[in-house]
Protein backbone atom coordinates (compact mmCIF):
# COMPACT_ATOMS: atom_id res chain seq x y z
CA UNK A 1 0.00 0.00 0.00
CA UNK A 2 2.75 2.42 0.97
CA UNK A 3 4.76 1.84 -2.21
CA UNK A 4 1.67 2.34 -4.39
CA UNK A 5 0.75 5.59 -2.61
CA UNK A 6 4.26 6.91 -3.14
CA UNK A 7 3.97 6.32 -6.91
CA UNK A 8 1.19 8.94 -6.82
CA UNK A 9 3.34 11.43 -4.92
CA UNK A 10 1.61 10.72 -1.62
CA UNK A 11 3.82 10.64 1.47
CA UNK A 12 1.88 8.56 4.00
CA UNK A 13 2.24 8.95 7.77
CA UNK A 14 2.53 5.34 8.96
CA UNK A 15 1.44 4.39 12.47
CA UNK A 16 2.03 0.86 13.73
CA UNK A 17 2.48 0.52 17.50
CA UNK A 18 3.59 -3.11 17.18
CA UNK A 19 6.27 -2.68 14.53
CA UNK A 20 9.91 -1.96 15.26
CA UNK A 21 10.90 1.51 14.06
CA UNK A 22 14.38 0.25 13.19
CA UNK A 23 13.11 -2.79 11.27
CA UNK A 24 10.48 -0.77 9.38
CA UNK A 25 13.12 1.67 8.21
CA UNK A 26 15.75 -0.97 7.42
CA UNK A 27 13.48 -3.46 5.63
CA UNK A 28 10.93 -1.16 3.98
CA UNK A 29 12.37 2.36 4.11
CA UNK A 30 9.32 3.41 6.14
CA UNK A 31 9.48 5.84 9.03
CA UNK A 32 6.96 5.04 11.75
CA UNK A 33 5.09 7.79 13.57
CA UNK A 34 3.03 8.05 16.72
CA UNK A 35 -0.74 8.47 16.55
CA UNK A 36 -0.22 12.09 17.66
CA UNK A 37 1.71 12.68 14.41
CA UNK A 38 -1.25 11.45 12.35
CA UNK A 39 -3.20 14.70 12.21
CA UNK A 40 -4.54 16.81 9.35
CA UNK A 41 -5.02 13.72 7.17
CA UNK A 42 -6.72 13.67 3.79
CA UNK A 43 -7.31 9.94 4.03
CA UNK A 44 -7.01 7.31 6.77
CA UNK A 45 -6.19 3.70 5.94
CA UNK A 46 -6.74 1.12 8.67
CA UNK A 47 -4.66 -1.75 7.31
CA UNK A 48 -4.04 -3.84 10.44
CA UNK A 49 -6.39 -5.03 13.18
CA UNK A 50 -4.22 -4.23 16.19
CA UNK A 51 -6.14 -3.67 19.43
CA UNK A 52 -5.00 -0.03 19.43
CA UNK A 53 -6.88 0.50 16.16
CA UNK A 54 -9.87 -1.64 17.13
CA UNK A 55 -10.30 0.62 20.16
CA UNK A 56 -10.70 3.71 17.96
CA UNK A 57 -14.25 4.83 17.37
CA UNK A 58 -15.22 6.45 14.10
CA UNK A 59 -15.36 9.74 16.01
CA UNK A 60 -11.73 9.16 17.02
CA UNK A 61 -10.87 8.51 13.37
CA UNK A 62 -12.61 11.74 12.31
CA UNK A 63 -10.31 13.72 14.62
CA UNK A 64 -7.35 12.66 12.45
CA UNK A 65 -8.58 14.56 9.39
CA UNK A 66 -7.98 18.11 8.30
CA UNK A 67 -10.28 20.40 10.21
CA UNK A 68 -11.67 22.23 7.17
CA UNK A 69 -15.38 21.55 6.77
CA UNK A 70 -14.95 21.45 2.98
CA UNK A 71 -12.48 18.57 3.01
CA UNK A 72 -13.98 15.16 2.34
CA UNK A 73 -13.02 12.53 4.89
CA UNK A 74 -11.97 9.28 3.21
CA UNK A 75 -11.52 6.04 5.18
CA UNK A 76 -10.17 2.76 3.81
CA UNK A 77 -11.09 0.00 6.24
CA UNK A 78 -8.92 -2.83 4.91
CA UNK A 79 -9.59 -5.16 7.84
CA UNK A 80 -13.35 -4.53 8.14
CA UNK A 81 -13.13 -3.20 11.69
CA UNK A 82 -16.25 -1.07 11.33
CA UNK A 83 -19.74 -2.11 10.31
CA UNK A 84 -21.10 -0.89 6.99
CA UNK A 85 -23.97 0.74 8.85
CA UNK A 86 -21.62 2.68 11.14
CA UNK A 87 -19.50 3.72 8.17
CA UNK A 88 -22.55 4.98 6.27
CA UNK A 89 -23.78 6.90 9.31
CA UNK A 90 -20.35 8.46 9.88
CA UNK A 91 -20.65 10.75 6.87
CA UNK A 92 -17.20 9.71 5.65
CA UNK A 93 -16.54 8.32 2.23
CA UNK A 94 -15.30 4.80 2.78
CA UNK A 95 -14.01 1.70 1.09
CA UNK A 96 -14.02 -1.63 2.87
CA UNK A 97 -12.51 -4.94 1.83
Language model features with spans:
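Structural/interface elements that position substrates and couple domains in central-metabolism enzymes
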Residues: 1-97
